Amino acid sequence: QVYANPIAYSTDQHGRTYVNSKSGFLISVQPSRSTSRGSVNIQSPNVKVSPLINANSLNTKDDQLMAIKAGRMIQQIANTKAIKSVTKKAFDVNFMNLDDEGLLNSFREFASTVYHPCCTCRMGRSINNSVINNKLQIHGLKNIRVVDASSFPNITSGNINAPTMMLAYRAAEIILEDNF
């Protein structure tokens, strides 16, 4: 998924992203079918202690090749007459002259999740490879269900808003069937 934002972002010394006060835009790519898998682990019985989250981005060769291909595509778009006519200079990193390794390093440094996490409580048949069953119940428990994008067994090819609404609609039907 390629998108352009009419705003520019920068990253501070602590790795936090902020909106740059200067006029700018962003051309970006969001791979829709990542093959890398991360993890979310509980590190304490204390609910106030955050879980350990490892996105594990760009861990597979397929994802690395996709990032390089995406970087090359962004370079081609940025090199068009139309984009060049409205561009003075790059804010943080000039992607135009990066080789494959440079593109990967840049993606590792600046990439983010775009706030659409899913598949962390995966639906499946077995407790060995999933958290919930096909009725959205946590394996081994009857009255607790997971009804959000975390229950998807696989990430969708695009934004997850509509599939999440469809899941919620189906979950309501399942809950009514089970209780009436």
Describe each region flagged by the PLM:
Residues 1-163, 171-180:
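FAD-dependent oxidoreductase catalytic-site/capping-region signature
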